[in-house]
Amino acid sequence: MSNIHDHKILILDFGSQYTQLIARRIREIGVYCELWAWDVSEEQIKAFAPNGIILAGGPESVTADNSPRAPEYVFNAGVPVLGICYGMQTMSEQLGGKVIQGVGEGEFGYAQVEVQAASELFKSIEDAVSDSGKALLDVWMSHGDKVSEIPEGFVTVAKTDTCPYAAMANEEKRFYGVQFHPEVTHTRQGKRMLEHFALDICQCEANWKPSSIIEDAVARIKEQVGDDEVILGLSGGVDSSVVAMLLHRAIGSKLTCVFVDNGLLRLNEADQVLEMFGDHFGLNIVHVDAESRFLDALAGEAEPEAKRKIIGKVFVDIFDEESRKCVNAKWLAQGTIYPDVIESAGSATGKAHVIKSHHNVGGLPDDMELGLVEPLRELFKDEVRKIGLELGLPYNMLYRHPFPGPGLGVRVLGEVKKEYCDLLRRADAIFIEELHKADLYNKVSQAFTVFLPVRSVGVMGDGRKYDWVVSLRAVETIDFMTAHWAHLPYDFLGRVSNRIINEIDGISRVVYDISGKPPATIEWE
C-alpha cells in the first residue's frame, strides 16, 4: 500500500478566508495536502515534492505595489498549478498576462460562467446548456480585479458577461486559473473540478482516508515513543478522546489518561467519560475529583477573563501534580489539530501563514521535561471526527455541539457557585433532551443554557416564589464567525420552559436569547 503522504498537493496561502476550505476539500477527495505561506522558499517546495500546487485567493490587489506573488519556482517545478481568484490573477501577471483593477464592477456572489473551450479541469461538467449549446456552470465569485489579458500559451476556458476570462488554461504546461471559488458549496460542481485537478491532472492516488490515517498514526506513535509510557489529559472532548483511542491502539497499557472533573461539566458527563473509556474501552484512567478545588479558586470572581485564567491555572497545577506521579512517563500527548498549528506571520503583507514548530495548547509547565506526541496535528476537525468513528467512538459524542474549555464556568454569569452549576446542569440537560426528541438538535449549530445571577418572581400553586432565571441559546452558523439565532418553534420553547420551571426547584423564569453574532457573541461570556 502507498504511503498516505506520497501523493500530495501544496496550497499556497495569500490570505483568503477560504484557504483552509480548499485544503479540506482536497482532503475530502482523498489526497493529502498542506497549507503554506505564499513566500515559501524554492528549497522548501523541492523538499515537500508536491504532485501539484494550488495558488489560493487573497484580499490584496495584484496591481498594488508589494502585493504577494507566487515563488517563480512554482511555474518551473514541472507540476500542475491551479490558481484560484487572486491565485489566477498572480499566475496571469507573473507569466506575462495583465490584470486590471476593478472599478465598481467586481463580481460578488452567484454567477454563471459559459464554457468557451474544452479543458481537463471542466471535463464532463455542466449545470445547464446555453442557447448556443455551450456548457454553463453555476459558480461563486468574489473579486474586484480581473485578468484583462491572458499569458501566451493560455486559452480562455470560461467567461461571464462582465469577466471575459473567468477561467484560463495552458493544457501543455498543465496550468489552470479560475476566477471563481470551486471550494465553496455555492459552486455546484466545484468538488468535481478539484477532483479533476488532484486525481486526473496531478495523478494523485486517493489514499488519504480514515482507515489509512489511523494505520499511519499508530505506526508513527509506535516509532516515536517506542516502549516509553505516555500521559494524556482526557477531557471527554472530541480531540482528546480521539488521541486517547489512537494511543491506546498503538501502545495499550503504556498510556495513562488523567481525567480532571472540575465540577463545571455537563450533567453526568464525568460518569459517562469514565464508563466509556475506562469500563468499555479499557483505558487506564486516573480520575481526579477536583470540584471543590476549582470552585474555591473561583469564589468571589465575576470577571469572565479572570475566571478563564483561574480555571486554566488550576487545571495545569492539577495535571502537573498528577503527571509527576507517573514517574515512568516520558511523553505528553496533546490533541493539537491542524488549524491550531497555522498562525499569522509577519510577511511583507502580514497575510502569510507559517507552521508553528510547537503548539502547547495546554499551557503546561516547561520544566515537565516530557516529549510531545501530537497524532492529530495534520488533521482538520472534520477528519478527527471521521477517524473517531472508525475507532469506535459513538456518533453522538463526536458530533456534539461545541462546549467551551472552561465549561459551565463561562455559562454561569458572574461568580460561579456549586448551587448555580447544579441548577444550570439540569436545565441544560432538559433543553438538549427536548432538542433531540423534537429532531432539532442537528438542525442547529449550537444550543445551550445560561444561568443568570438574577432572581425573578414566579407563582407556583397558591404561593409566590423568588428564584433564578436561565436563558436558552440556540444558533445557526456555518463557521461560528457569524451566526443567526435559531427560530425554534414556539410550542417547543414553551415545552422546554414548562419542564425546567416545573422540574427544577430554584428556577422561576426561562428566557430565549434572540441575539445574532454580531453584535452579540455566541457564548455570553
From Swiss-Prot:
Active site residues per record: C85 (nucleophile), H181, E183
Top EC class of this enzyme: ligase
Reaction it catalyzes: XMP + L-glutamine + ATP + H2O = GMP + L-glutamate + AMP + diphosphate + 2 H(+)
GO MF annotation: an example: ATP binding
GO cellular component: cytosol
Alphabetical list of InterPro entries matching this protein: Class_I_gatase-like, GATASE, GMP_synth_C, GMP_synth_GATase, GMP_synthase, GMPS_ATP_PPase_dom, NAD/GMP_synthase, Rossmann-like_a/b/a_fold
Record pathway: Purine metabolism; GMP biosynthesis; GMP from XMP (L-Gln route): step 1/1
Listed CDD domains: GATase1_GMP_Synthase, GMP_synthase_C
UniProt: ATP binding residues: S235, G236, G237, V238, D239, S240, S241
Keywords: ATP-binding, Glutamine amidotransferase, GMP biosynthesis, Ligase, Nucleotide-binding, Purine biosynthesis
Assembly notes: Homodimer.
Record function comment: Catalyzes the synthesis of GMP from XMP.
Name of the protein: GMP synthase [glutamine-hydrolyzing]
Primary gene name: guaA
